[in-house]
């Protein structure tokens, strides 16, 4: 796992790798060894590429127009490489979305601009991706998630939203967020969105109040589900534990879980959101083979199949707080006790979200697992494969 530290007020460019086996962090060299613009990272856009590398762009300032550099970190070589220097729009407060063709989409955050661009990891170059029907950025921008259909739902910090179709490289309008009773427009500035098992999207909202000096994200922050079939927003009932009337959407942290639920953390509170609906069978992972059907603790096994990493990144924030979950997980249920445990999965050949793409990964079972006949399932993006 890669982590880059450096909010604007911290003025750092520290970067770390997390070792899940030893539960420890190791500091690595910063992008470009900290030279040039990379003396601090700010709140940079970044994305995990399907081959395991991480792409990170310079945060910059709205007052400067020359910040178009990106770096790619290769965990195998432990090295950074300059890329994407032909980008036209600023990367300030932008977000990067992995597409179903393994490319990366971003909506530019220059004020008053509606343009978008696509990065091709194979060439290291950006190309135009059309214009959104309405401006989505307002010094901040909302999350943009690839849906199981392959289209991208891009949410705006202006109240406007849009859908991108990679097949046609074109945009269409999605419904705006509603207004509050006092007339303030609900928006998604620095807000999380999560794909639900049904393919709908859970998102938090807020208001974005700007003066001549600065902009402030404020509550209330009601939750909505985007119904991808109806192309409509549905208000989610308020919760007493984390009341939307006193919360700021930018302070939520949301994570999709292999149970199909969404974990929502806000300050010192944690709760779980359960939705209705089931996934389409064509979204399910397909397990072609497993290296052994007799599973023993502390032994490595390999699974091969298709769509093992799902058809979406799972979660998106907009810029600096990404926690994508497009990687496979192994769930083991003891038939007698129905106790569930999870193996540690690793060495993913690919985390591509292309439909029907083939891949492999390894897993190792916890030494403390219960003995006895068990059901093994592969989980991706809250969707279980048939029992194996």
Model-predicted segments: where are they?
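Beta-propeller blade signature
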Residues: 13-21, 68-75, 115-121, 161-166, ...
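Immunoglobulin-like IPT/TIG beta-sandwich domains and homologous Ig-like subdomains
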Residues: 1, 30, 39-42, 126-131, ...
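Short glycine/acidic-enriched loop and turn motifs that connect beta-strands
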Residues: 4-9, 60-65, 110-113, 159, ...
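Trp- and S/T/G-rich repeat-edge/linker motifs of beta-rich repeat architectures
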Residues: 19-35, 72-86, 123-134, 168-183, ...
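Beta-propeller and closely related beta-sheet repeat lectin domains
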Residues: 42-46, 93-96, 141-144, 189-193, ...
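A detector of repeated loop/turn-to-beta-strand junctions in beta-rich toroidal repeat architectures
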Residues: 12, 43, 65-67, 91-93, ...
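Blade-level signature of beta-propeller repeat domains, shared across WD40, Kelch, NHL, RCC1
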Residues: 247-284
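Entry beta-strands of beta-propeller and related beta-repeat scaffolds
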Residues: 1, 5-9, 51-57, 101-107, ...
